[in-house]
């Protein structure tokens, strides 16, 4: 748990080291939720209790268990998109979210579903709660739950999406797809039993709506996520620059201008992350918390910068990337021809092919497109993120200047 800005900066370095080990392609490594659980344990008092259990104590004890046993937690908060025009309790299928169907002295039984649970197949536990941007209403009380459960709970089903790897191709042809396909899954609960000791919210709409924000998890998991985002953006930016150089395009002013936009974008994101740390605050529990407004600025902007880096790489690599041969061709009859035809004064044929394969995998393969989609939407609805950023903007200095100018104008007006 960070107590000073130096602690937060140290966590930044740890997040960065983990992200660099996977080139920023794994969005939900264990450090994401583990940092949130550490903070939840400190702030858990708001969870209160009911006639069966002490929710605050449950959160604290679970955090200790996670730390002691090095538990990898995945999470699922988004409800399936079935009918957004109806309240969640008015959708008859029972799969519009996860809801309590029975409770007794030992715990609760839940059924329902959550979508886009990343890393579920390899995680140990699953944390379930509701998204803060889609608030529950009073009639939704059975859906007002937050709990943790092992993913091997007999009542939990993991339904994975289609794989994006290429098992018949080598890792040289698909260096990302064949190594870093982070699996997303649809999670179904079928009368799954959750003991009270692992329940943090139950039958309490207000607490369900407050859980992610008031727990402090949002700010601290956002910090981890944006450090990972920097790493991913740095890979995409560096790849565009390397492509331009290897293909002999970096001497043209127009290309340099495109690349300069990418490097400027990267610096802006790095600077904003630093601002989130330097302008953080010590909360009432003594936790040094990053500036969420700065982090949300990154979340609303980084996906577009990442998208731009991919598009620049596509435009520069173009036909060279689309027509790149399988690396297996270098072991066949065409090896001599390819070595002669594709070698330049800037790269051997094999180096050029490896680079173009990487460019295709990141920008144009199914894996690459999933990564782009993930970057846009994994942090929540981009429209809501920007609307909330506007609502929380601190423009006191700007408004004071406007008021001063208007006041000066009035003072010089003869009525």
Regions of interest found by a model, annotated:
Residues 293-415:
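Alpha-helix capping/hinge segments and adjacent helical runs
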Residues 276-285, 323, 327-330:
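Active/binding-pocket-proximal capping segment
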Residues 253-260, 288-296:
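Short, charged, amphipathic alpha-helical segments
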Residues 224-282:
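Extended amphipathic alpha-helical segments enriched in small hydrophobics
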Residues 78, 245, 271-278, 307-314, ...:
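Charged/polar positions within long, soluble alpha-helices
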